[in-house]
């Protein structure tokens, strides 16, 4: 929730002893924030930003999971996802394709595409990207593997 507009300031006001405030979208910035030594830093949502450069450790050969969309726009009564993860943010098709290609080259055989609602993939990109187009693109990757 801290990445949502205004939440970082609200937390800082209520808990002034907290040195760093950042949300799940900014976990990749943690090292640079800590090494910079600047206390009182908080990072709010950066409109659709997705850090594709985070290191991934996979220990589930031959299965791999690939996030294609983060967040949710549904705000179901019983669910906290939109409040914690924010609104839907899709990765680009090129980014997803590159990750799946790497996985196939590394020998992964079953690749599961992840998201709270994968059918919403691409709607936020406003460039005609759809889940169906992503599936067609990934189906053209050479190699023996299964998409789920």
Residue ranges and their predicted role:
Residues 1-121, 136:
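Proteins enriched for Cys/Gly/acidic motifs involved in redox and nucleic-acid/cofactor modification
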Residues 124:
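Active-site core of PLP-dependent enzymes with the aminotransferase class I/II
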Residues 127-148:
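Alpha-helix-loop-beta-strand connector modules within alpha/beta enzyme cores
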């Amino acid at each position: 929730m801290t990445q949502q507009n205004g939440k970082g300031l609200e937390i800082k006001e209520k808990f002034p002893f907290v040195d760093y405030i950042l949300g799940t979208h900014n976990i990749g910035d943690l090292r640079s924030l800590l090494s910079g030594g600047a206390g009182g830093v908080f990072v709010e949502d950066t409109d659709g930003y997705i850090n594709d450069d985070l290191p991934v450790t996979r220990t589930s050969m031959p299965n791999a999971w690939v996030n294609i969309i983060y967040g949710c726009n549904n705000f179901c009564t019983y669910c906290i996802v939109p409040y914690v993860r924010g609104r839907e943010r899709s990765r680009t098709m090129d980014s997803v394709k590159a990750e799946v290609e790497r996985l196939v080259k590394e020998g992964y055989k079953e690749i599961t595409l992840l998201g709270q609602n994968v059918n919403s993939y691409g709607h936020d990109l406003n460039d005609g990207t759809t889940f169906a187009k992503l599936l067609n693109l990934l189906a053209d990757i050479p190699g023996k593997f299964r998409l789920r």
